[in-house]
Swiss-Prot record:
Binds 2 Mg(2+) per subunit. Only one magnesium ion has a direct interaction with the protein, the other interactions are indirect. Binds 1 K(+) per subunit. The potassium ion strongly increases the affinity for DNA. The gene is xni. K(+) binds at L176, A177, P185, I187, I190. This is Flap endonuclease Xni. CDD domains: H3TH_53EXO, PIN_53EXO. Mg(2+) binds at D109. The lineage of its organism: Bacteria, Pseudomonadati, Pseudomonadota, Gammaproteobacteria, Vibrionales. Residues 189-194 are annotated as: Interaction with DNA.
């Protein structure tokens, strides 16, 4: 059979829907609106397999915070009523025929990336539903990223327009320029413009760090902050080698009987 796997970045969807509610937040209403969105996604994408991937709810901030202690520091925590109602939302997803997968200590991003790449590398179609541009580093002819809220594809032309680099260069770009919203520092004094210029001269961060002919204006900064650049690139890179404790058959999409 032809496979089309749709992977939902669950909290990316849920938190945006919940925050957009007028008046007092209501988890049941959040679940209802999310299910309306998912029904549209299913109709639009016609998946053969589908799964919603959730972050774990533990206190462990994960391997990225061990490399960069300030990683994602200061972000608003999940509203308590939303965290308490997560089971209600997951049950509503299941009623639509969408199983939920919890990351169990790994960031959901890495679990999404591992699953998506495993299927896409077998020349089967994968669509990730998320506004997170970090997934764009995975783009390939068989792997797409869809921003549901903006109704647009985060594809190669989007990446080139937004950043000026190829999708596979994004971790190198972020290793240089950083990501301020995630407290990923990159190299102080190297902003988007300089990062783009460097990646037009050299193919990746490793080559930049080893180059003996670096333009003088950047030499000192890059030499001084080499470790920050390497850690930033690693944190911005998605892991794609996690162990998956299930197979595709477990997430096959079966439309619920009306």
């Amino acid at each position: 059979m032809t496979i089309h796997l749709v992977v939902i970045d669950a909290l990316n969807l849920i938190r945006r829907v919940h925050a957009a509610q007028p008046g007092e937040p209501d988890v049941k209403n959040t679940a209802r609106v999310c299910c309306q969105a998912l029904s549209k996604i299913i109709k639009f994408s016609e998946p053969s397999h589908i799964v919603a991937v959730f972050d774990h709810h533990g206190d462990d901030r994960g391997w990225r915070a061990k490399l960069l202690p300030h990683y994602k520091e200061g972000r608003k925590p999940m509203p308590p009523e939303l965290q308490a109602g997560m089971e209600i939302i997951q049950d509503a997803f299941m009623d639509l025929g969408i199983d939920s997968l919890l990351s169990d200590g790994d960031e959901a991003d890495d679990l999404v990336a591992t699953l998506a790449l495993k299927v896409a590398s077998r020349h089967q179609q994968v669509t990730i539903i998320s506004t997170d541009k970090g997934y764009c580093q995975l783009l390939s002819p068989t792997l797409r990223v869809r921003d549901y809220f903006q109704q647009r594809w985060l594809d190669s032309p989007f990446v080139e327009k937004e950043y000026g680099v190829k999708p596979e260069q994004l971790p190198d770009y972020w290793g240089l320029a950083g990501i301020s919203s995630s407290k990923i520092p990159g190299i102080p004094g190297i902003g988007p413009k300089a990062a783009l210029e460097l990646l037009s001269l050299y193919p990746d961060l490793d080559t930049i760090l080893q180059a003996e002919d670096l333009p003088t204006k950047w030499q000192k900064k890059i030499t001084k902050h080499r470790e920050s650049a390497e850690a930033s690139k690693k944190v911005a890179s998605l892991k794609t080698d996690l162990t998956l404790g299930f197979n595709l058959q477990d997430i096959r999409y079966l439309a619920p009987s009306s």
